[in-house]
Amino acid sequence: MAERENRRGNRRDREEAAPEFADRLVAINRVSKTVKGGKRFGFAALVVVGDQKGRVGFGKGKAKEVPEAIRKATEQAKRQMIRVQLREGRTLHHDIEGRHGAGKVVMRAAPEGTGIIAGGPMRAVFEMLGVKDVVSKSLGSANPYNMIRATIDGLKKEQSPRSVAQRRGKKVADILPKRDEAPAAEAAEA
């Protein structure tokens, strides 16, 4: 049985070589296009893909059949992946705000054991990213496309203390707040 190849190489091997990605179907819509003879119906799928180790992407696909729309969305999501630095491999480094259109998303780092406190499409992004503890709130648009784009926008803005220190020409210890001094300062004020 001969394997089919496309212009970029062996397609089947490439798909089998990337099983480390998990995907989550966020939304599927029935869409219609009005043509001369009536309406043509199709489907639009929104998929989030990630390796649960700090990489995530989303894609949308349209087709006449649901499986084909999901396949197209998954391929687009794999092409549009971004890398996010996670603190201790479980949460964000700092509070972030993301925007897209009328959608606004606020994400906050959370202590260990908090879990993912997020609604709808944001939860799918965090699960595929590998975040274990986060608190988030969606303000404005509840459209899943806008919520995911706003979440990705916020995640792109995240910076690790190491990158901030490197950019400023300082040490990481100078960037991070000192944990021992914070309670002592509060006790001195009281």
Curated annotation (Swiss-Prot):
InterPro entries: Ribosomal_Su5_D2-typ_SF (IPR020568), Ribosomal_uS5 (IPR000851), Ribosomal_uS5_bac-type (IPR005712), Ribosomal_uS5_C (IPR005324), Ribosomal_uS5_N (IPR013810), Ribosomal_uS5_N_CS (IPR018192), Ribsml_uS5_D2-typ_fold_subgr (IPR014721)
Basic and acidic residues bias (residue ranges): 171-182
Gene3D superfamilies (UniProt xref): 3.30.160.20, 3.30.230.10
Keywords: Ribonucleoprotein, Ribosomal protein, RNA-binding, rRNA-binding
Pfam families registered for this protein in UniProt: Ribosomal_S5 (PF00333), Ribosomal_S5_C (PF03719)
Domain of life of the source: Bacteria
S5 DRBM domain boundaries: 21-84
Family: Belongs to the universal ribosomal protein uS5 family.
Subunit annotation: Part of the 30S ribosomal subunit. Contacts proteins S4 and S8.
Protein name listed in UniProt: Small ribosomal subunit protein uS5
Organism: Ruegeria pomeroyi (strain ATCC 700808 / DSM 15171 / DSS-3)
Gene this chain is encoded by: rpsE
